[in-house]
């Protein structure tokens, strides 16, 4: 299972959505939504960037989350995405100070 597939499944389950529900919400035809999402989660198909961006928006995550190699990086991306502009500025300043 690819990193993208793993993160997609985890994010969908956290959102308490079925594969079909998520697929329909991002504009996939209801007749094929479940099957297509299943293929993405199993790594049999790879969604293009446009679809990943739709998935990210629907799940409240940055698109980069799905491509993060490590779990720490993925968690940091999630947390950063949730911050307001001031929080992001402060976190970037702190990161610069640590580096």
Model regions and ranges:
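Residue-level signal for the short linker/turn that defines the boundary of a DNA-recognition helix
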Residues: 3-6, 16-17, 32, 47-50
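Positions in alpha-helical segments
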Residues: 6, 35-38, 74-78
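Short basic helix-loop element that most often maps to the first helix and adjoining turn
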Residues: 6-26
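Recognition helix of helix-turn-helix/homeodomain-like DNA-binding domains
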Residues: 27-46, 68
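DNA major-groove recognition helix of helix-turn-helix/homeodomain DNA-binding modules
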Residues: 44, 48-65
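Interfacial/linker helices and their anchor residues that mediate assembly or domain coupling
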Residues: 69-99
């Amino acid at each position: 299972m690819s990193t993208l597939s793993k993160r997609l499944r985890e994010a969908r389950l956290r959102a308490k959505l079925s594969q079909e529900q998520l697929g329909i919400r991002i504009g996939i035809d209801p007749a094929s939504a479940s099957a297509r999402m299943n293929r993405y989660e199993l790594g049999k198909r790879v969604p293009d960037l446009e679809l990943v961006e739709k998935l990210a928006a629907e799940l409240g995550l940055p698109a980069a989350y799905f491509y993060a190699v490590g779990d720490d990086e993925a968690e940091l991306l999630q947390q950063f995405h949730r911050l307001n502009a001031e929080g992001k500025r402060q976190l970037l300043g702190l990161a610069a100070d640590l580096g």
